[in-house]
Amino acid sequence: MDSDDLQVFQNELICCICVNYFIDPVTIDCGHSFCRPCLCLCSEEGRAPMRCPSCRKTSEKPNFNTNLVLKKLSSLARQTRPQNINSSDNICVLHEETKELFCEADKRLLCGPCSESPEHMAHSHSPIGWAAEECREKLIKEMDYLWEINQETRNNLNQETSTFHSLKDYVSVRKRIITIQYQKMPIFLDEEEQRHLQALEREAEELFQQLQDSQVRMTQHLERMKDMYRELWETCHMPDVVLLQDVRNVSARTDLAQMQKPQPVNPELTSWCITGVLDMLNNFRVDSALSTEMIPCYISLSEDVRYVIFGDDHLSAPTDPQGVDSFAVWGAQAFTSGKHYWEVDVTLSSNWILGVCRDSRTADANFVIDSDERFFLISSKRSNHYSLSTNSPPLIQYVQRPLGRVGVFLDYDNGSVSFFDVSKGSLIYGFPPSSFSSPLRPFFCFGCT
């Protein structure tokens, strides 16, 4: 191959973004290839849809596999390029020979005689070009790890922003349902109601401040990590000799990034005891509200419900039936009028759905959340995160998840369904009044989300 052909061949191994030999090359949908780090840095923080820096075509696929052929050829091209290793800084003072070897143990450049000395002869030594490529591989892994932290932090920041706005809406809703519940009480509790509303306002303001502070910390952390990522990217493109002398503190930096990663706020409001509420509810108590017959139930969550429960991860959240892990218990009777109260023990399950729904027990086993005239409180656990929510419309409940018995109160004539934490004597949530048009039956499903 003559020099012109060689130059053409080498040009095919150069990334058009950094104008260096490829580092961890990927080939995107349009056929153009780039260093993965270059693509991450210039593709709007790595979020899809991404546009090709060369032809501007949209690429739907967010992640690409490494082009192993390009990677190998680029590595060989780097190792065969001229190395400026004869500078005075790279001449051994003791033996006056060029340092052409790298000591893996001491992370130092050595000349031949030094590598055979008693101090180094038991260590592993590599040619500088080969050692530099090994070092770049380690740097790429560190960069991948750093980018994962970056993406996780960015997702947390987006979720934190969403939580801030949804919490504001929730606090407004909670004020209304607290006021409505006190209006239903047979005794005047004006002072207690005002105390609860004022306490709710104080707690909410504290949580809003925590969320705002968290957003600032995450934004600052993203900037630091982007700078660190760019620094590692620049280190990868250093000449071999400079690279090997500069790489000692890489792992310490990425470990520090993980340790300093801000954790998202998990906002939780106090649900205060309402004096006499359980005594009032027990006047309408229904014994054996639920049947003793358990039926395998195939639960599907509508997309808006999954989004509320799982946030930005809702597309990967479960939608399909969970098979025999899910069982439903229907009410022993359907209600068409009056007030009715019953309790269900949820102590033994983290995943459950509780409430009332249109009388459709004879329908097939497929059950979709959310549909008309289905009023549910939903508890779910994914990884180590617990979520409490309601449907119709989907709404996260920013109160502590009940761990014992949950009370359900149906006021059919006034079109309302409410949930209570029995151990606290507190209101969890009350659906806004509506008009029921069909019989409603108690429903409980566990192990279903």
Curated annotation (Swiss-Prot):
Keywords: Coiled coil, Metal-binding, Zinc, Zinc-finger. GO terms for cellular component: cytoplasm. The keyword Zinc-finger applies. It comes from the Eukaryota. Zn(2+) binds at residues 92, 95, 114, 120. A zinc finger (B box-type) spans 87-128. Signal peptide: none annotated. The keyword Membrane does not apply. GO terms for biological process: innate immune response; regulation of gene expression. A zinc finger (RING-type) spans 15-56. Residues 189-225 form a coiled coil. Pfam families: SPRY (PF00622), zf-B_box (PF00643), zf-C3HC4 (PF00097). Disulfide bonds: none annotated. One of its GO terms (molecular function) is ubiquitin protein ligase activity. Residues 268-449 form the B30.2/SPRY domain. Belongs to the TRIM/RBCC family. This is Tripartite motif-containing protein 64B. It comes from Homo sapiens (Human).
